[in-house]
């Protein structure tokens, strides 16, 4: 009974206790509202009110259900696309959508903006010291070893063999069967299964066979989702001490997290042990995957390599499936774009090879446009190692969290024009004056930081695009993905460590007329 009451009361009890601290502490923080109110879409948007000690926690909690959109609204009305969000006990977070500031923290002052202790401590139970939760020599080592997986030869093998096999032998039969039964599929779940099989194949040389006609969910998949969600929700608490107390007493969400992480790490360690055994039994492997490279590099500690495995599952499974989920919803909402893609595919062979996939220029633009509006990672944060001043004049104190808001940047008129809300792949294209074909014209990575930028830019960007284009070709060339009627209204866009469509993506599959 004590544990139950503690679980329920903690998020409310601690902020209340803060309010009755001595008057001397009362003035440690003061309201800091630098942006005046304005009107956007007939809704009055203002910088959240800040109170002593609890900062803007009340506004944050009120908007927790739509925190990404709420923070995006504020970024867009802020004069320099940057504002300060006051946390509890004087903590400050600067949130920006300013490309100059993004370049400043991701490139120009890279060494001063790291994965700080706020980030690493919060995610250490789940991600350990994997590449997304570390800095310095450890990060450099993991990045260097992983980079060998993303050369042209590896990407070609990935597209022509791994992705194509998963399409031909698993996804296409499931979709074909669905056209006959007219049953409803959760397409978000289907895509997550597909990309999970793919990342395990290319990175670990292991096929989990998760994409099957059965809708039963594996114990690992459920544990992985729980670990991702609960770890992410730690960031939303007013004080870290709340989740730390729950962890100490092993209650509530922290008890579930411990159970989930145990299951996830058990899976990862099993992969590591099997790969070690394979390396011991064979003098050489037919194909050298990323896991083999890490184990052959002299770093054979099981816990450390398990951290790497978990991080790369996060990178390869969740982000790609998130991008494709929103892409197929947008395609249904914009039949003109779908017809353009069908037309592009009509000029390709059915069993597309690497070069044909690479030349899917319009589809590449459509995917880029989709991720502009619905980025797989809508926000990312760094922590200042030392005091600094941002290009737009904001003063950053040591230990301050600086967050760049990718979702907001994709909706800024200053970057995309008055038609920013329109799904228009042509904004990424130009006509070649000689042959009249489309040519893709990219944006600089600081205005479009969907794949991060600077030294931490995503290693798998090219592989991700190639995988997505091959999947789009395999599906759109044969089928129509038709969402349920209620999805005519924009579904909920939520995010844990990567974005999702709230409530799944229920669809029916129809055969495309030839």
From Swiss-Prot:
Keywords: Endoplasmic reticulum, Heme, Iron, Membrane, Metal-binding, Monooxygenase, Oxidoreductase, Transmembrane, Transmembrane helix
Domain of life: Eukaryota
Catalytic class of the enzyme: oxidoreductase
InterPro entries reported in the protein's UniProt record: Cyt_P450 (IPR001128), Cyt_P450_E_grp-I (IPR002401), Cyt_P450_sf (IPR036396)
Stored Pfam families: p450
Inducing factors: By clofibrate.
Function in brief: Catalyzes the omega-hydroxylation of various fatty acids (FA) from 10 to 18 carbon atoms. The substrate specificity is higher for laurate > palmitate > myristate > linolenate > linoleate > oleate > caprate. May play a minor role in cutin synthesis and could be involved in plant defense.
This protein's name: Cytochrome P450 94A1
